[in-house]
Amino acid sequence: STCTIRTGSPAAPRYVAELLYIPPAWVSEHASLIDATSPSGTGERDYALLHITKSVDDAPLPAKFTALPLYDGQLTKNAIRGEVIAAGYPAVYAAGDTDTNLRTRSATTSVSELFTFGKQDVDVLALRGSSMGQQGSSGGPVVNADGYVIGMIATRGNDAADGPGSLRAITIDHINRTITEETNASLNQHLSGDITSRAQIFATTMTPFLTNLLTEEIEQ
């Protein structure tokens, strides 16, 4: 199968990508949900890295892609009540046509609470309700006042506590810690150096195993 990345507003096909990394532990735990129409989860290890290999029209790739900087430090309680911007492509606004009418949106909100999957590390941000709290926002960045991406939208939040459209986002620190734990290489290391070779190694060593897990669930 082909992974096509869309960019712009409205979103249009621009690039072809391959899988660079996905946490095997997450795939193993959630393989049974592959056919679920409305799967849910906590966001723990719920991320993937993609490697852009070419343009859809075979035009030369840019020497460097424009990107927001990642905040790779540990968040503290000072992040609570901090103003942030959440952005993405909430499909609810696409008027039923996500192929041609998917547009970027963003909203200013704030962090209401911090959560951990362990004992003390900040793994999840609770975001107060906003227009971004819609289906399709997952994967969008959460950007702090300094312009750094501190998290990635993962799940719906608790509307009773944080208002309609609340969200939960896993922190960049969570992604960095878990990918380092699983591979002995940090997030920044995965995003630099010989990415093509790293993607090929994952494809030959892990992809067959993960594909088999999913295939077994589908065929049950």
Predicted ranges, named:
Residues 1-2, 42-47, 79-81, 106-108, ...:
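Extracytoplasmic
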Residues 2-59:
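Conserved catalytic-core segment of clan PA serine endopeptidases
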Residues 12-31, 80-85, 102-116:
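Beta-strand/loop subdomains of soluble extracytoplasmic proteins
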Residues 29-41, 53-101:
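Active-site substrate-binding loop(s) of clan PA
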Residues 46-48, 180-220:
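PDZ/PDZ-like groove recognition
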Residues 48-50, 85-86, 151:
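Structural recognition of the beta-strand scaffold that forms the well-ordered cores
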Residues 53-69, 95-189:
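Active-site region of chymotrypsin-like
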